[in-house]
């Protein structure tokens, strides 16, 4: 997997202060995408052992609420194994941190992926460029664990 950046102290991509991993690779190519530079899965940097440790160190800071996977699309097929490995590690070894994931796939397309059990919040659906201020009107913020338990989409806060 390749990535473009690991940012810390982000307040726009989930609850609290977060570390965000911006991955390379996206096959949705949304009109008006804010990150078209991330579409090519071979651009950016190779996500190696050093990058993995950097991510864990940043997430492990006491004031960080958790990690957000964005991009590109973290669920681009070539990214899935690595993303789910990272999510599993964080949930198991860095307690108290939440895992958010932004994707262009619909929940209904990806809910059965084995690694979804490591994701707390999923923001699904393609970007809608007609909604400029707070994201996209068509995106859902899904509580993954509650949705997996009930078999129906449960939005965060319900």
Language-model segments: residues:
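Canonical Radical SAM [4Fe-4S] cluster-binding loop centered on the CxxxCxxC motif
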Residues: 14-49
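Short, electropositive, low-hydrophobicity segments enriched in small/polar residues
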Residues: 18, 29, 75-76, 108, ...
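Short Fe-S-cluster ligation motifs
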Residues: 54-75
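A cross-domain feature marking catalytic cores of carbohydrate-active enzymes
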Residues: 23, 71, 101-103
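Auxiliary Fe-S-binding modules of radical SAM enzymes
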Residues: 2, 6-15, 60-62, 92-158
